[in-house]
A protein has these predicted regions:
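N-terminal non-catalytic cap/leader segment that marks the start of a structured domain
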Residues: 1-114
């Protein structure tokens, strides 16, 4: 199962790749949650989905729901922007002088161990 963070206009949603097409998983989650009121699965990013204690359970339930009610065609999206898999990273790690030519450009010898900052 491959997930994407996607956007159409200003609306973000989770996309689910299905045979070279993309299902609007966020929309499927909203429909599922509306019908089965015990679940509040209103997620617009992969990070939000992963905040669940058991995201695999959620994905399985919704995938079964989509199949059972033959909803794929109504959930496919055609034209959208693919966003970063992590929309709000908690930290960013960079690697300094990570190749010989770059180290020499900056006037340094290549490091023996990676320089992270």
């Amino acid at each position: 199962m491959k997930l994407l963070n996607c956007q159409i206009d200003n609306e973000r949603f989770i996309g689910l790749l299905d045979n070279n097409r993309t299902i609007n998983l966020s929309k499927a989650l909203k429909v599922y949650s509306t019908i089965y009121r015990g679940e509040d699965w209103f997620f617009n990013s992969i990070e939000d989905l992963l905040s669940l204690d058991n995201p695999e359970f959620c994905l399985k339930k919704v995938a079964d729901f989509i199949e059972r009610y033959n909803l794929k065609e109504s959930l496919y999206v055609e034209s959208f922007k693919t966003l970063s898999p992590i929309i709000r990273p908690s930290k960013i790690i960079a690697l300094g002088r990570n190749y010989t030519e770059h180290a020499r450009e900056t006037g340094y010898n290549p490091p023996e161990e990676p320089i992270f900052f």
